Curated annotation (Swiss-Prot):
GO terms for biological process: catabolic process; L-leucine biosynthetic process. HAMAP family: HOA. Pfam families: DmpG_comm (PF07836), HMGL-like (PF00682). Belongs to the 4-hydroxy-2-oxovalerate aldolase family. InterPro entries: 2-IPM_HCS-like, 4OH_2_O-val_aldolase, Aldolase_TIM, DmpG_comm, DRE_TIM_HOA, PYR_CT. CDD domains: DRE_TIM_HOA (cd07943). Its EC number is 4.1.3.39. GO terms for molecular function: 2-isopropylmalate synthase activity; 4-hydroxy-2-oxovalerate aldolase activity; manganese ion binding. The keyword Metal-binding applies. It comes from Mycolicibacterium smegmatis (strain ATCC 700084 / mc(2)155). This is 4-hydroxy-2-oxovalerate aldolase 2.
C-alpha cells in the first residue's frame, strides 16, 4: 500500500498537468526534450506532482483522440528520470487504458495513478483502483463533468471510488462550467462523505475565467489537492494557471511549497515556448464553459468546422445541448452535417 505523498508543511498539494491536459492544446505532439525541460523547471520550482500522459490518458493515442508524436510511456520515463523531487503522475480512463498500461507506467517511473470516469460511472474504476493499490501506487480518482450532477450524487460516486482504494477523489470541472458556490458545495459534500477515508481535490478550467477563483473556493471548502497548468497550458481556455494560483495562495496564506518567482520563470521561459499558442478565452472556449462542454472538444470542433465549413462555436453549443461527454467527440461530425444541411436548406429558399 502507498501512503499519500504530502509534506506536513503544505496546506494543499499542487499537481501541474501541463504535460497531460496541455497535450490536448498541443494535439499530443510533445517531444522528449520538451518534457525534459518542463519537468526540470517545475521540479526546481518545487512542484510536488507533475502529470505526464496523452491528453486522454494511457492508451489515448488513437484515431478517435489523436496520435502522440512521442509514445507516452517514453515521455513518462523521461519525466521520471529528470525529476529530482517531484513525483510523476499518469492519467488513465477505464476503457481507453488497460491494466497493463498501468503496470508499464509504473515500471517507467510513474508513482501516482489518476483514474478518471464520467461523474456517474465511478463503478467502472473499481478493479483499476484495486490493481493500482496492489502495485503500491498512490491513487487519485477523477469524477469528470462534475457540473452535471448534484453535490449529493457526486458524493455517492466519490464513496464508490474511496471504497475501491482511491486515496483522493477530485471534483473535476471538465467543462469549466462551475461557478464558485457550485465548486464549494461539491467539495464540501465530498469532504463530509469521505471524512478521513480519502482526501478531496479540485481540477478547474478557465472557460468562464474562474479557474483560480474556483480553486480558492475548493481549498476553503476543504480540498487538499489542487490541479493547474503553467501558463494555463490545457484543453479549452486552459487550466487554472499554476503561477497565478501560487501568487494568490501566497497572499491568502495557503502553503504549497512552490516558489512563486521560480514558477513564474518556468511558465514564462520554459512552458510558454513549448506551447503552439496561448490558451485563449475566446468565443469557442467561452461557449464551452457556458454550455457545459468537455474542454477537450475544442480542437475536435475546430477540425470539423474547417472540414465542413460550419462555425465551431455552433458545434460546441449543440454538443452542450446534447449533453455529450468525453469519448463522444465523433458526434461532432453528426452535428456538423446537421448544421450544414440547415445552411443549405436556408440558402435554397
Amino acid at each position: 500500500m502507498s501512503d499519500i505523498f504530502f509534506n506536513p508543511i503544505w496546506d494543499v498539494r499542487m499537481t501541474d498537468t501541463s504535460l497531460r491536459d496541455g497535450s490536448h492544446h498541443k494535439r499530443h505532439q510533445f517531444t522528449g526534450e520538451e518534457v525534459r525541460s518542463i519537468v526540470a523547471a517545475l521540479d526546481a520550482a518545487g512542484v510536488p506532482v507533475i502529470e505526464v500522459t496523452h491528453g486522454d490518458g494511457l492508451g489515448g493515442s488513437s484515431f478517435n483522440y489523436g496520435f502522440s508524436k512521442t509514445p507516452e510511456q517514453e515521455l513518462i520515463k523521461i519525466a521520471a528520470e529528470t525529476a529530482k523531487e517531484s513525483k510523476i503522475a499518469f492519467l488513465m480512463l477505464p476503457g481507453v487504458g488497460t491494466k497493463e498500461d498501468i503496470k508499464e507506467a509504473q515500471n517507467n517511473g510513474g508513482s501516482i495513478c489518476r483514474i478518471a470516469t464520467h461523474c456517474t460511472e465511478a463503478d467502472v474504476s473499481i478493479q483499476h483502483f484495486g490493481l493500482a493499490r496492489e502495485l503500491g501506487l498512490e491513487t487519485v480518482g477523477f469524477l469528470m463533468m462534475a457540473h452535471t450532477i448534484s453535490p449529493e450524487k457526486l458524493a455517492q460516486q466519490a464513496r464508490i471510488m474511496a471504497d475501491a482504494g482511491c486515496q483522493c477523489v477530485y471534483v473535476v470541472d471538465s467543462a469549466g462550467a462551475l461557478v464558485l458556490e457550485g465548486v464549494r458545495d461539491r467539495v464540501q459534500a465530498l469532504v463530509a462523505e469521505l471524512g478521513s477515508d480519502a482526501q478531496v481535490g479540485f481540477h478547474g478550467h478557465e472557460n468562464l475565467g474562474l479557474g483560480v477563483a474556483n480553486s480558492v473556493e475548493a481549498v476553503r471548502a476543504g480540498a487538499k489537492q489542487i490541479d493547474g497548468s503553467c501558463r494555463r497550458f490545457g484543453a479549452g481556455a486552459g487550466n487554472a494557471p499554476v503561477e497565478a494560483l501560487i501568487g494568490v495562495f501566497d497572499k491568502i496564506g495557503v502553503k504549497t511549497g512552490i516558489d512563486f518567482f521560480d514558477i513564474a520563470d518556468a511558465a514564462e521561459e520554459v512552458v510558454a515556448p513549448a506551447m503552439p499558442a496561448e490558451c485563449l478565452l475566446d468565443r469557442n472556449a467561452l461557449i464551452m464553459g457556458y454550455s457545459g462542454v468537455y474542454s477537450s472538444f475544442l480542437k475536435h470542433a475546430i477540425r470539423q468546422s474547417e472540414r465542413y465549413g460550419v462555425p465551431a462555436h455552433q458545434l460546441l453549443h449543440r454538443a452542450g445541448q446534447r449533453k455529450l461527454i468525453g469519448g463522444q467527440e465523433d458526434q461532432l461530425i453528426d452535428i456538423a452535417l446537421e448544421i450544414k444541411r440547415e445552411q443549405e436548406a436556408a440558402a435554397s429558399k
